[in-house]
Amino acid sequence: MTKRRVVVGMSGGVDSSVTAWLLKEQGYDVVGLFMKNWEDDDDGEYCSTRQDWIDVVSVADLIGIDVEAVNFAAEYKDRVFAEFLREYSAGRTPNPDVLCNAEIKFKAFLDHAMSLGAQTIATGHYARVRERDGRFELLKAFDHTKDQSYFLHRLNQAQLSKTMFPLGEIPKTRVREIAAQIGLPNAKKKDSTGICFIGERPFRDFLNRYLPTKPGPMKTPDGKTVGKHIGLAFYTFGQRKGIGLGGSKDGSGEPWFVAAKDIASNTLYVVQGHDHPWLRSRELVAGNVSWVAGEPPADGARCGAKTRYRQADAPCAFGRAAQAGDERFSLVFDEPQWAVTPGQSAVLYDGDVCLGGGIIESAATGRAGTAPAGRAPALVEAR
């Protein structure tokens, strides 16, 4: 009887390594595939590609599977990084890991795996796939503290039907135990953090290599200039560190936060205090939508939503756009949400089931009547 072939995306980390081992133990014909998605820093201090490949080969030798490397750097630059720069240039804060999953790991990678004769692909993501009544559902991981369904919400039925997440039912602590028990050479390797192509390097330094600085005024809600920014692209809503402002003598003395960007005047608005009304939103509008089931929830449906990773699901009401052909949606939250950021993803849930979501275009904050005379700075609007 021919074994079912599964191609596992292997990064050199513990999660994907244990994924490959588990599937091999379950009797699958496992092939490891290492993706190289970034080439600009092959010799830089922050590039770990060479060591990651060495770790992949070592793990493959130990568990007895074939492994190969594939270069998706061109696809990544075209489908992910170019959009990343466009969004930052427009003053928004994108999440490239969401786009990378949809366009690279579960599209380019999936296509390549099928060319190798695979019936299924698998990754080390913490999430689950469930088939019900002929449809595939994306669910949160058993270990909610490690759940990554937020980053996977743009996957469609075709992609989910060919995907396995073996770690979805396993706590992260158990994954580490398995790695140590079977003697994986990377058992103590730290989890990767940060945006995949940036790694551990200072984000502002990285962004400055691709986007020019464009200094402008930094103002308070009443129009007072309190400093100068280096360029709107280098700041995000709710940001506290790196603003360059201490507590002012005539202010509250509380920390400063980025609260709004006025693209037309190149002005960055800052406020003092974590609970300032400019940082709180009860409503948002999102576009560029993607629904796991292929269609949105019913108008007025109750659901939970995340506007950032690791955020607890916030109860809200879902609203469809009134105009025919407009796929955007609105969310009205039961409680104000903090620093809802244009460019980030609003992801909807029905319990553990991820419904999909969209890219945040705008959010209504408590700013009425507080803007400088003659101009109320609007949150950045997506195209």
Curated annotation (Swiss-Prot):
Protein keywords: ATP-binding, Cytoplasm, Disulfide bond, Nucleotide-binding, RNA-binding, Transferase, tRNA processing, tRNA-binding
One GO term (biological process): tRNA wobble position uridine thiolation
Annotated catalysed reactions: S-sulfanyl-L-cysteinyl-[protein] + uridine(34) in tRNA + AH2 + ATP = 2-thiouridine(34) in tRNA + L-cysteinyl-[protein] + A + AMP + diphosphate + H(+)
Keyword check for Cytoplasm: yes
Stretch list, region Interaction with target base in tRNA: 95-97
GO cellular component, one term: cytoplasm
Gene Ontology terms for molecular function: ATP binding; tRNA binding; tRNA-uridine 2-sulfurtransferase activity
Site (Interaction with tRNA) location in chain: H125, Q344
Top-level taxon of the source organism: Bacteria
Active-site residues per Swiss-Prot or TrEMBL entry: C100, C196
Binding site for ATP: G9, M10, S11, G12, G13, V14, D15, S16, M35, G124
Enzyme nomenclature, EC number: 2.8.1.13
Alphabetical list of SUPFAM superfamilies matching this protein: Adenine nucleotide alpha hydrolases-like (SSF52402)
Cystine crosslinks: C100-C196
Family: Belongs to the MnmA/TRMU family.
Classification via Pfam families: tRNA_Me_trans, tRNA_Me_trans_C, tRNA_Me_trans_M
Name of the molecule in the record: tRNA-specific 2-thiouridylase MnmA
Organism: Burkholderia pseudomallei (strain 1106a)
Record's function text: Catalyzes the 2-thiolation of uridine at the wobble position (U34) of tRNA, leading to the formation of s(2)U34.
Interaction with tRNA, as annotated region: 146-148, 308-309
Subcellular locations according to the entry: Cytoplasm
